[in-house]
Amino acid sequence: MPAHIISSEQQRGRMLCTPIPKLIVSLSIPTLASQLISVFYNTADTYFVSKLSTSASAAVGVVFSLMSIIQAFGFGIGMGCGSIISRSLGSRDNERADRTASSAFFFAAAVGLLICIAGLCTLRPLMRLLGSTETILPYSESYARIILLAAPVMCASFVLSNTLRSEGEAMLSMYGICAGGLLNVALDPLFIFAFDMGIAGAALATALSQLVSFCLLAWLFLHGRSIVRVHVRCISKRPGLYGEILLVGFPTICRQGFASLSSALLNNAAAVYSDAAVAAVTISNKVYLLVRSIVIGIGQGFQPVAGYNFGAGDKKRTRQAFWFSVLLGTAVCIVCAAVISLFPDEIMHFFRDDAEVTRIGRQALLYACAVMPLMGYSTYVNQLYQCLGFHQAATLLASCRNGLLYVPLILILPRMLGLPGVEMSQPGADLLTFVVSLPFQIWFFRHKLR
């Protein structure tokens, strides 16, 4: 065996014996880098496209809802197979891990192809549904058409990166994602301005970057750099495995799916006021997503640790992993909230030098900062249930923030408060999600981790 490739038993020993803080930090750093790079190149799209016009900037927010749909299925299938893989490796069932990874990879690519076909066939009504006004529509159609063509590659990449993370090889996962993200940032100004492609150039830069990430991740598997194998011979013919992958990943599908729904509802609610309102909430959401990506990156370091140790029967280390993640995530959120609260105008001006966009976006950022420190706890309670295979509760928790709690707020608050109601809806949902998560965490620790 080459020296650079760690054996499954060595990896198992690392996951079960390394001190929890050191282990989670070591796994979180590459996942954080991956998350931040992903958000960074999405934010780069917003930054460069905002230089075109306010309507073009708003179109990025509209198409973000579509990208959330693609991510819902790709990331959901990836998280589903990742949870099964980490628990399988923890219990020394490597054959099941190979079968799960291979089946999930080809399944995700097929789902991405279906999304591509369905989206292209219904593009104009889909863009209207997601919040495009007549002035935003030409930009959103141009952007979405190219993004849809990349959907199969995007979905498959999510499975490959989650497979690497689930076996504890978060650093390898980071390489592919970061390379694609950095390429995206380099190509954006080239395609948008130098080649005069406008918003279509931003979409093409994103699609090509996703393809590069996929090729790099696939290379790692083809050259034996992973513990888990992905091969057509390992594809399962048993429908039950696909059902289990979807069942475990369903909380993520719900969470991301509701993120798409909430984004569409937010765009439609803001569009009542102006394109500037849509652009403002798009930019403020990108900033909020940047912080959330840090929280999720820590959680992606936490999940394989919890899965391995719970699968091996070590409840104490599972508890320690949860609380360390909560403390780390909360500290990060407090720092980010403080920085954003001090410089809201400067942040909005960075993206779009428009007084109306800044005025609306500033208030949205301040509302978000008020509840930001609660984000880590509710996120990790949800991830705890999901990575340990408690599907129904995980699905319920995942549906709260962007669905069960958010949808009523975005439908009611704007009618009562006007534009401030639009800005307060997501922070309100975050606060309520924290309250709902408390009894779930207390029950789980008393009955499953005692």
Go through each PLM region and give its residues.
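Short alpha-helical transmembrane segments in multi-pass integral membrane proteins
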Residues: M1-T31, I85-P152, A194-F250, A306-V371, ...
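Transmembrane helical elements of multi-pass membrane transporters/channels
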Residues: V25-D45, I146, G180, S209-S213, ...
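Hydrophobic/aromatic residues in alpha-helical transmembrane segments
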Residues: I29, D45, C81-G82, T122-L123, ...
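Helix-terminus/linker motif at the lipid-water interface of multi-pass membrane proteins
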Residues: L36, F40-A58, M127-E134, L190-M197, ...
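Membrane-helix interface/capping residues of multi-pass secondary transporters
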Residues: T46, T54-S57, N94, L123, ...
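Small-residue-rich hydrophobic transmembrane alpha-helices
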Residues: S57-I117, M154-S173, N267, A280-P344, ...
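Hydrophobic transmembrane alpha-helices of multi-pass small-molecule transporters
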Residues: I69-A72, N184-P189, F214-A218, L290-S293, ...
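Short runs within selected transmembrane alpha-helices of multi-pass transporters and secretion channels
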Residues: G78, I147-R165, S173-G181, A202-L217, ...
